[in-house]
Swiss-Prot record:
Sesquiterpene synthase that catalyzes the formation of germacrene A. Can use farnesyl diphosphate as substrate, but not geranyl diphosphate or geranylgeranyl diphosphate. Beta-elemene, the initially measured product in the assay, is derived nonenzymatically from germacrene A. Expressed in young leaves. Detected in trichomes and cones. Pfam families: Terpene_synth (PF01397), Terpene_synth_C (PF03936). CDD domains: Terpene_cyclase_plant_C1. It comes from Humulus lupulus. The lineage of its organism: Eukaryota, Viridiplantae, Streptophyta, Embryophyta, Tracheophyta. This is Germacrene-A synthase. One of its GO terms (biological process) is diterpenoid biosynthetic process. Keywords: Lyase, Magnesium, Metal-binding.
Length: 563
């Protein structure tokens, strides 16, 4: 960490020197690559027309035929979802799965000859869509008299992979799925170790799954990966494959156009020069929000949420890296008041600049909404205020050189990670009747699914920074606080925190089972935020230090179309 000295004028105009700690920042790796993207409305409409025509064919071929048996229909649904096409056929998929679920419940539907792959696929798809199916009822028959998974399953590699994916839909206390995860991970790893070449489709699928199972994968990245695998399957459905490629490239064009608009906003706002101490990551931030919702109808929501997280990122760097405690107290008070007339009390100038940008942005959010929707911005403001209050608490810990207890740390840092604010803010621009005042009130209480997503964010971020960063952060982290409170080693702290992350994923799975407290499209935002953490923070801080995973993800979704 280096230091810089700045001259700053206080309110009584007395000049004093401020020692500001600063990290050496990695500049944006993208430059102005995404600033200009030109695609005509005519070209977009043509692509959309092609997709619509193929959608009609697929709907008739796949969802219009009732003669398929359950196994075949589940496999078709799985292919449609993994190709990234499920958002086109939501009602059809839901109806099919509800029919399968009702058979399971009403007719004690147990297929004695159902193999491991089919049983695992049925379980995963039903759980994925919120149906409460019993893991014990489905998987107990694959165990031997000693309660272990049968050894004969080891040779069923496809079945093992399917069970592995299903095990990631487990809820708290489902021991059989914990055992399934251990069993499949061991034998799938051995399968790869015993192969000299990993170029065949199955080996590629297994490698990808072991790195990141479907439940934790960004839908668009997983779709891009699977499209290439599916294309090499001899029995692939040509219409489905063609639709998947066209749809992927159409969405990419839409997203590139949006990113171009967002990049212009970032450049015209001149944030890089106004806040030279802040991370220049607008492309990565757009990718973050693309993980939350990629569907075309969420254009406004993406625009608002990308700007929100960009402002939050600047605020994070102000509180963590740049501001003095006196400046941070002033800024926190100003944001609490949310009154432009307070701006003259802010010094130095960068505080005024940030405050003005913040208030103007939220005013623009209101203007982008209908009159009946403007109430939503109030809830987002309250969460942003809460975020800065927690950031000030953390700044005081740093100033005092204090390492809080783990319990005290979590109380503040779960707010400070920003995910509660972002989950609430993700609803501002969402159209439709499911987003209501009651939903915002529901989210204002400490809900389990929100807390679980926030826990994943906080702990994965802290582990990544503490474990992988050469330059240790001076502010307290979950790792350090846990070591202090419980008197354990660094590795023991990692183990415990990782267990909490695993448990949080199980809580998310449980909260998404029907009936849910609010509509599923609301809750799934928490799931999608968590998926992004697994991508960017599993092996380091992929946001601050843009590396291979980040570059690959941006290239796959926002640069290279599928040929």
């Amino acid at each position: 960490m280096s230091t810089q000295i700045f001259a700053s004028s206080s309110q009584n105009e007395k000049i004093h020197k401020i020692l500001r700690p600063t990290k050496k920042l990695q500049p944006s790796v993208w430059g102005e690559r995404f600033l200009h993207y030109n695609i005509s409305e005519q070209e977009l409409r043509y692509k959309q027309q092609q997709v619509e025509e193929l959608k009609a064919v697929v709907k008739k071929e796949i969802f219009g035929e009732s003669a398929y048996d359950v196994s075949h229909q589940l496999k078709l649904i799985n292919v449609v979802e993994r190709l990234g096409l499920s958002y086109h056929f939501e009602s059809e998929i839901e109806n099919e799965l509800e029919s399968i679920y009702n058979k399971s419940v009403d007719q004690n539907y147990i297929l004695k000859d159902e193999n491991l792959h089919d049983a695992s696929l049925r379980f995963r798809l039903l759980r994925q869509h919120g149906f409460r199916v019993s893991s014990a009822d489905i998987f107990e028959k694959f165990k031997d008299e000693d309660g272990n998974f049968k050894e004969c399953l080891v040779s069923d590699t496809i079945g093992l992979l399917s069970l592995y994916e299903a095990s990631h839909l487990s809820c708290v206390g489902e021991n059989i799925l914990d055992e399934a995860l251990d069993f499949t991970t061991t034998h799938l790893t051995e399968f790869l170790a015993n192969k000299k070449e990993h170029d065949d489709p199955l080996s590629k699928e297994i490698s990808q799954a072991l790195e990141r199972p479907l439940r934790k994968s960004l839908e668009r990245l997983a779709a891009r990966h699977f499209i290439s695998i599916y294309a090499n399957e001899t029995s692939h459905n040509k219409v489905l494959l063609q639709l998947a490629k066209l749809d992927f490239n159409l969405l990419q064009s839409i997203h590139k156009k949006e990113l171009s608009e967002i990049s212009r906003w970032w450049k015209e706002s001149d944030f890089v020069h106004k806040f030279p101490f802040a991370r220049d990551r607008i492309v990565e931030l757009y990718l973050w929000i693309l993980a939350v919702y990629y569907e075309p109808q969420y254009y406004l929501a993406r625009n608002i949420l990308t700007k929100t997280i960009a402002l939050a990122s600047i605020a994070d760097d102000i509180y963590d890296e740049y501001g003095t405690i006196e400046e941070l107290e002033l800024l926190t008070e100003a944001v609490e008041r949310w009154d432009i007339n307070f701006i003259d009390k802010l010094n130095p100038e960068y505080l005024q600049t940030f405050y003005k940008e913040l208030l103007n942005s939220y005013e623009e959010f209101e203007q982008a909404l209908s009159k009946e929707e403007t109430y939503r911005v109030h809830y987002a403001k309250e969460r942003f205020k809460e975020l800065l209050r927690s950031s000030l608490e953390v700044a005081w810990w740093l100033k005092e050189g204090r390492v809080p207890s783990f319990d005290e740390y979590l109380k503040i840092s779960l707010i400070n990670c920003g995910y509660h604010m972002l989950i609430v803010s993700s609803l501002i621009g969402m159209k439709g009747s499911i987003v209501t005042k009651e939903v915002f009130e529901w989210l204002s209480i400490d809900r389990k699914i929100v807390r679980a997503s926030v826990t994943i964010c906080r702990l994965m971020d802290d582990i990544a920074e503490y474990k992988f960063e050469q330059e240790k952060n001076e502010e307290p982290s979950a790792v350090e606080c846990y070591m202090k409170q419980y008197g354990v080693s660094e590795e023991e702290a990692y183990d415990e925190l990782n267990k909490r992350v695993v448990n949080a994923w199980k809580e998310i799975n449980e909260e998404l089972l029907k009936p849910t407290g609010v509509a599923s499209p609301i809750l799934v935002r928490a799931l999608n935020f968590s998926k992004f953490m697994d991508l960017f923070y599993k092996n380091g801080d992929g946001y601050t230090q843009v590396g291979k995973v980040t570059k690959h993800s941006v290239a796959a979704l926002l640069i290279h179309p599928i040929p």
